[in-house]
């Protein structure tokens, strides 16, 4: 259990655009896709913006989905290479749905494609990349996972850090995702656009009493 009365500054970043191979029912079939050309352009613009903003981050936490890792690698390139900001890959930050595009890759394959980051949490996770238990693709489980993540953020020693993740995950942190909303295709209303980043203040009391407030 994390201590009570904890405040953190978190910069949420949604990954860039991907090209989905969609079947006749609108289901995305491509497994764990990378960014498309437009997504890489968005990530380069993110890099430009982040370099100009000089975020005072001490740590980067990133989803193990390849589109999030690629966004992070491009967007935070100079923070990682010049400022030596550490990167931890956190399976709890994966996307919530269970379409093929939202199912992660094996850790050993991620380490080959995106080397140099801390994959300890992935190696220690007995479930990832399977969509079971805490990663089951339903609303109730996703709410539970957001609570686990809030406690995880509270326990992180760093006070200011970036989180590169997915649109639905951010909606869950904001407590605006509804039971009827899709977990696979992020609703367009009140959602982050590709590579959007925003500063939030997190206040944590316990696993049922926490909130993320945007900094305007």
UniProtKB/Swiss-Prot annotation:
Could you tell me which SUPFAM superfamilies the record lists for this protein? Phosphoglycerate mutase-like (SSF53254)
One Pfam family per UniProt? His_Phos_1
Which InterPro entries does the record cross-reference, listed alphabetically? His_Pase_superF_clade-1 (IPR013078), His_PPase_superfam (IPR029033), PGM_Phosphatase (IPR050275)
For this UniProt entry, what is the primary localization, expressed as one broad class?
Answer: cytoplasm
- Extract the signal peptide range: none
Enzyme Commission number: 3.1.3.-
Q: Which Gene3D superfamilies match?
A: Phosphoglycerate mutase-like
- Marked site (Transition state stabilizer) residue numbers: 166
What enzyme class is recorded for this protein? hydrolase
Q: What subcellular locations does the record give?
A: Cytoplasm; Nucleus
Per UniProt, the keywords (alphabetical) are: Cytoplasm, Hydrolase, Nucleus
Q: Which GO terms describe its cellular component?
A: cytoplasm; cytosol; nucleus
Instruction: Name a GO molecular-function annotation.
Output: phosphatase activity
Which residues are responsible for catalysis? 15
Q: What is stated as this protein's family in its record?
A: Belongs to the phosphoglycerate mutase family. BPG-dependent PGAM subfamily.
User: What's this protein's name?
Assistant: Probable phosphatase SPAC513.02
Q: What is the organism field in this record? A: Schizosaccharomyces pombe (strain 972 / ATCC 24843) (Fission yeast)
């Amino acid at each position: 259990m994390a201590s009570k009365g904890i405040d953190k500054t978190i910069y949420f970043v949604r990954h860039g655009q991907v090209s989905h191979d969609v079947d006749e029912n609108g289901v995305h079939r491509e497994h764990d896709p990378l960014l498309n050309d437009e997504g890489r352009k968005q990530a380069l613009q993110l890099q430009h913006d982040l370099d100009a903003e000089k975020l005072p981050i001490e740590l980067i936490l990133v989803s193990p989905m390849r589109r999030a890792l690629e966004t992070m690698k491009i967007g935070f390139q100079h923070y990682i290479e010049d400022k030596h900001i550490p990167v931890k890959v956190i399976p709890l930050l994966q996307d919530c749905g269970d379409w093929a595009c939202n199912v992660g890759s094996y850790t050993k394959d991620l380490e080959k494609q995106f080397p140099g980051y801390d994959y300890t949490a992935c190696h220690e996770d007995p479930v990832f990349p399977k969509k079971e238990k805490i990663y089951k693709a339903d609303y109730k489980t996703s709410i539970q996972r957001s609570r686990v993540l809030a406690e995880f953020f509270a326990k992180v020693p760093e006070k200011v850090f970036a989180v590169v993740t997915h649109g639905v995950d951010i909606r869950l942190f904001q407590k605006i995702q509804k039971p009827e909303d899709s977990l696979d295709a992020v609703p367009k209303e009140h959602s982050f656009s590709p590579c959007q980043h925003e500063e939030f203040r997190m206040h944590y009391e316990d696993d049922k009493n926490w909130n993320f407030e945007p900094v305007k």
